[in-house]
Amino acid sequence: MGIEVGKRRLVYTTSRNNDRNLDFLKRRRIEDSSSSSDHEDNQRGSLSSSSSSEEDSDRDDSHVSLRQSVDDRDLEITKKREEILDTSEIKPIERQKKSYDDEQGDVDQICKWFMDRYKFPKILYASELLEKATPLLPIVRDMYRGLVDSHYKFEANEMRQSSQRAILSVQEFRNMDLTKFTAGYYGMKRQFQIGEVILQKYKSFLLRRQGDTMKWWGVSDFAHYVLAPEVLVSLCIKEMQLSDDVYDKNARERAYDIFVNTVKFGTLVADQSPLEPWEVTP
């Protein structure tokens, strides 16, 4: 029931209705309060998430901005100006150094192994070598007098007989196993020093006594690869005290065996050792 005033309708309610309305309002306030609290929590969570996202975004933006602020061309120019090597340029150098270190380590191990096994005398400088070997050079003549059976001369003759040519060709020389003509632990460098001295002292003597084998080899190569090792066999007998007599057949056989088994030391250790004292690095 009610009275209409203009367009507004006035409603008169009873006390019972008022009580119901009051209860309804209380419930609404409680619900509103709870809803408001949840809304504030959600809002705070949203704000926190938004803030975190903004911070992440800021960090990402700053990160991207930092990365994009350096031009690749500027880096290349700086590298060239400062002569800086990049990683791709450094790695090969590191590998090369490592490879060299490994190789040097192998040489040291080889040297120690042979020294422990054979008790070699010290590696001689050229002047020391010539001083010790010069008194032994007459064995070159004695080889042609039948006083010495030459192991290396026999090998040289075998090589000549297996060839189809009148003289040693370049290709045959390249294919030759020169370890058969290497004076073991003395190495090829010191062997050639002896070969040069032999040519200086005995070249005319050798030219007068050229047989088929020496002609096939040539006098120079014959002196370096056949005669020089025989002189060093005599020196080995002296230095390693295999016998008091360098013409002792058994002692020479022992020296030949030592040479055959120590070529690796000669090529990797002795040939890397300086011939002159001034070549030694401090």
Curated annotation (Swiss-Prot):
Which key words are in the record?
Answer: Cytoplasm, Nucleus
Cell location: Cytoplasm; Nucleus
> Basic and acidic residues: which segments have biased composition?
22-43, 60-70
Q: State the residue spans of region: Disordered.
A: 22-70
Q: Is Amino-acid biosynthesis a UniProt keyword of this protein?
A: no
Cited InterPro entries: RTC4, RTC4_C
Gene Ontology cellular-component terms listed: cytoplasm; nucleus
Keyword field contains Mitochondrion: no
Entry-linked Pfam families: RTC4
> Mostly located where?
cytoplasm
The UniProt transmembrane annotation reads none
Q: What does this protein do?
A: May be involved in a process influencing telomere capping.
* Family note: Belongs to the RTC4 family.
> What's this protein's name?
Restriction of telomere capping protein 4
Which species is this UniProt entry from?
Zygosaccharomyces rouxii (strain ATCC 2623 / CBS 732 / NBRC 1130 / NCYC 568 / NRRL Y-229)
Q: What is the lineage of its organism?
A: Eukaryota, Fungi, Dikarya, Ascomycota, Saccharomycotina
Report the gene name.
Answer: RTC4
